[in-house]
């Protein structure tokens, strides 16, 4: 298909079904690749628009797209959203009764469905039957990191998905994830037999604030959380806890204070968990206190904050969980509580896991993030392989910056030692070389003959540990945990070595008990007028009524962003209504007159006749 036709077709689909005028970075290029029959690995942050990358090709291409998803709740949310946009979609899973399944199969066979969502087990079992007898436009593997043992959420049922290529050699496969480091990405490509491009979007979420609070007793943490929620009146939020016991305790304490909170964990029945999730989606519960299982299956755009009551097990988990907040692009706050008790408990979990070495390394990096005095956003971006050369200016560390000094020579000494040792040493051996210590590893490999041996003996071991951690977090080298923790100099590190880039390191000092919390910077400084705020509330109430009538969560009817724009612009005609962000042709026809009528009604009441 000619490029110009593809561009026109996909732009029309984006406007008509989703109400967007422009694609986000990488979306259009990914869609074109899939429509040309090519495989893709897509890395985009949560809320970055991954689903559009396979949904638009599914609408444009003949046949049915098969979407593999790990959670039934995730499938259900996405199918409901597609239906609300006028797109023929269905889910095939254990929740279907025999009648539902028969109807869905018939719709597949007749070509009526554009997308069908399945679990990995269901896909494998149906390959000889349903999927061998229908025209498949593409396969989309969501949460693709689950296929890799190097990933943070390995799921054995995903490991069979490599057979897709054997049975459907000419059908494009698009694998998508929000969290995968370089090693995990390589493993995904290998396991799924992908032979196309890899697209990596920016992992930066500038609308999220990042804060860490160290230590604190149970009562101090609860007091802070209560004050925090009172500072976010009516805003939906999630509190992640390490144990079921803590989810119940935190929810109970908040309810005592009059906050509408609910606990969510694996100890609840399937029906109880589904009820909590549904009430949260429908804005009937403000706060969910949950173990890590919660949130993966939710596409709720107006979560305004996330608190981690305990330290997460990895940066991947942390990034994915804070990604539940601010999916609509508006400012959102994230706070992480951190204590050594969490580290000890998580270490015991890692020791007992089947991937001890990998999990211990990931926990170590998470602990380093929590203890860091380097810009937190910079740490996250560098961890995921995205070069970040400047501090963000609005995390808690940047808001209260520590004292720094010119550390260029120190960094050059350390990186020179790494290079001269063939990039095969781990951090401990690097320190031995710099300090001039004849450790067994140094003697065995003749590292004491290197020019850099003893070049850093004027600094203590603990000083070098701190400086090397800063260098790692600033992205001057990376740790290859699949090569026994070998240090590898990055392109940014080479620039420092060549004298092309100066470096400021944090001056060592006693650790403070706590870094103050900052709030999300506002994406827009424009304050809504009182009249706009009043109209927004009226429109939000109308949206809730429409959602309840249809059994949808309110955000599926219209997003908060669309409501804010409606309250600000006050469209007078159906054409103007259809130009609002997030309102496609289907929603324009379905809801236009209803919302316009409410806007006119409010205008009359305020004396603004038109």
What are these regions (language model features)?
Residues 2-17, 21-25, 29-51, 58-61, ...:
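Helicase motor core with emphasis on the C-terminal RecA-like subdomain
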Residues 2-10, 358-360, 389-610:
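Accessory DNA-binding and partner-docking regions appended to nucleic-acid-acting proteins
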Residues 169, 233, 373, 423, ...:
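Flexible coil/turn residues that form the inter-helical turn or adjacent wing/linker of helix-turn-helix
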Residues 362-387, 535, 541, 548-550:
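C-terminal accessory regions
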């Amino acid at each position: 298909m000619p490029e110009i036709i593809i561009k026109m077709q996909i732009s029309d689909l984006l406007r008509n079904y989703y109400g967007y005028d422009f694609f986000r970075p990488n979306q259009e290029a990914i869609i074109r690749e899939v429509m040309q029959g090519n495989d893709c690995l897509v890395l985009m942050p949560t809320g970055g628009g991954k689903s559009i990358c396979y949904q638009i090709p599914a609408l444009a291409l003949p046949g049915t797209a098969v979407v593999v998803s790990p959670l039934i709740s995730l499938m259900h949310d996405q199918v409901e959203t597609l239906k609300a946009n006028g797109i023929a979609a269905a889910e095939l899973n254990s929740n279907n009764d025999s009648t539902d399944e028969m109807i869905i199969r018939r719709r597949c066979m007749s070509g009526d469905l554009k997308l069908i969502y399945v679990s990995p087990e269901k896909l494998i079992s149906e390959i000889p039957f349903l999927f061998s007898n229908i025209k498949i436009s593409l396969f989309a593997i969501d949460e693709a990191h689950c296929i890799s043992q190097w990933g943070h959420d390995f799921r054995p049922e995903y490991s069979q998905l490599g057979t897709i290529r054997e049975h459907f050699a000419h059908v494009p496969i698009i694998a998508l994830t929000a969290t995968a480091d370089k090693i995990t990405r390589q493993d995904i490509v290998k396991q799924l037999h992908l032979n196309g491009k890899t697209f990596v979007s920016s992992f930066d979420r500038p609308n999220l604030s990042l804060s860490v609070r160290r230590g604190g007793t149970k009562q101090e943490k609860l007091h802070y959380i209560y004050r925090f929620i009172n500072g976010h009146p009516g805003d939906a939020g999630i509190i992640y806890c390490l144990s079921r016991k803590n989810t119940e305790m935190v929810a109970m304490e908040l309810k005592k204070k009059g906050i509408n909170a609910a606990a969510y964990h694996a100890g609840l029945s399937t029906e109880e968990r589904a009820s909590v999730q549904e009430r949260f989606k429908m804005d009937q519960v403000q706060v969910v206190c949950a173990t890590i299982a919660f949130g993966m299956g939710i596409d709720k755009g107006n979560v305004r904050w996330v608190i981690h009551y305990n330290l997460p097990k990895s940066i991947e988990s942390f990034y994915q969980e804070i990604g539940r907040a601010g999916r609509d692009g508006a400012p959102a706050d994230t706070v992480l509580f951190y204590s050594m008790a969490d580290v000890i408990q998580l270490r015991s979990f890692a020791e007992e896991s089947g991937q001890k070495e990998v999990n211990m390394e990931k926990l170590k990096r998470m602990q380093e993030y929590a203890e860091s005095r380097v810009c937190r956003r910079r740490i996250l971006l560098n961890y995921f392989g995205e070069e970040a050369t400047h501090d963000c200016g609005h995390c808690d560390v940047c808001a209260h910056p520590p004292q720094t000094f010119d550390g260029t020579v120190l960094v050059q000494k350390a990186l020179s030692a790494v290079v001269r040792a063939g990039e095969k040493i781990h951090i401990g051996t690097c320190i031995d070389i710099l300090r001039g210590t004849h450790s067994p590893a140094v003697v065995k490999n003749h590292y004491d003959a290197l020019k850099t041996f003893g070049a850093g003996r004027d600094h203590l071991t603990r000083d070098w540990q701190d400086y090397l951690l800063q260098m790692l977090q600033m992205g001057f080298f990376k740790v290859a945990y699949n090569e026994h923790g070998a240090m590898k100099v990055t392109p940014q590190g080479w620039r420092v070595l060549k004298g092309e880039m100066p470096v400021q390191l944090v001056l060592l000092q006693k650790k403070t008990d706590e870094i103050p919390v900052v709030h999300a910077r506002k994406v827009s400084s424009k304050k809504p007028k009182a009249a706009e705020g009043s109209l927004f509330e009226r429109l939000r109430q109308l949206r809730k009524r429409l959602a309840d009538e249809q059994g949808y969560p309110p955000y599926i009817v219209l997003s908060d962003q669309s409501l804010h724009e409606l309250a600000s612009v006050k469209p007078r005609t159906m054409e103007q209504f259809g130009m609002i962000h997030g309102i496609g042709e289907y929603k324009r026809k379905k809801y236009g007159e209803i919302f316009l009528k409410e806007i006119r009604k409010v205008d009359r009441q305020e004396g603004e006749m038109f």
